[in-house]
Amino acid sequence: MFKYLLSALLLTTASAHADVIHQERSLYRNILVEESGDLRCLKFDEKARKSSQSCMFKSNPQKLVFNYTKLTFASLLMIDNPQNVLIIGLGGGTLSNVIHELYPTANIENIEIDPAVIKVARDYFYFKENEKVSSKVQDGRIFVKRAALKKQQYDWIILDAFNGDYIPEHLLTKEFFEEVKSVLAPNGIVAANTFSSSKLYEHESATYHAVFGDFINVVTEKNSNRIILAGFDTMPTTQSIAARVKKLRPLLSPYDVDIEALSRGMSSTENNQDWPKDTKVLTDQYSPANLLNLNSG
């Protein structure tokens, strides 16, 4: 718990005494890069509030700052040696950089609708691109539709296009999840960064369940995010997860990822659904995601 409190304190303190080192208005938002001591953060200035999208420690860029980013690596308890990775939503490129270091032979495609975000990630957050790592300016749903037409498949699909102020509603519908499922390789997994404390929770859960069946929530205390892990065929055994924890612990510890704690934060929805059976599924015709998220409770 102390780690989570310390992270929150660092971010709060940094925000209060930050220097703006870059500012621009893109086609989609106001973009800021702020520095406070050792911490550098990418922020979107929206609705009279700054929301942090990505942060790094300048002295140790590989050490992850945000808890939700760390939660994403619970995926590795479900899949082994991913070789084709799709990330929708770039931020500062943190996830891409870490995955590339862990799996240097993997092909990683980063899809980001805002070209200014990609440039900021390159210029200020050491986002790495090479023959294995690419970025593309495109709407995430359009990319997935075209990937499906090309019969492309991915072992690990990470949906990270949401923030606390705005949700692209077309990326949170049954139809979109069906499109995502169509490009998911056998034995692959979808990891979605989402919320655990708003009225959207039940609708989102019902929608994932309608497409993928039972899924796993990864939540740790003192954290307002959850990671949904979906698309797997069978739940790993306790023994299998323990073996993966042992294997992954030394690989992930340099990034400040406590994989054992993440394994304890996993809970399956099998015989454990925490939303009403009559919860309305989000569709292209019905997706008031931002209104539901605003009315948190």
Go through the PLM ranges and name each one.
Residues 177-240:
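C-terminal substrate-binding/active-site "lid" region of AdoMet-derived donor-dependent transferases
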Residues 47-55, 145-152, 271-273:
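Intrinsically disordered, low-complexity coil segments
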Residues 35, 63-189, 223:
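The AdoMet/dcAdoMet-binding core of the Class I SAM-like
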Residues 13-15:
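N-terminal signal peptide c-region/cleavage motif recognized by signal peptidases
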Residues 25, 91, 199-200:
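Short, glycine/acidic-rich beta->alpha junctions
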Residues 18-70, 74-78, 101:
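Rossmann-like AdoMet
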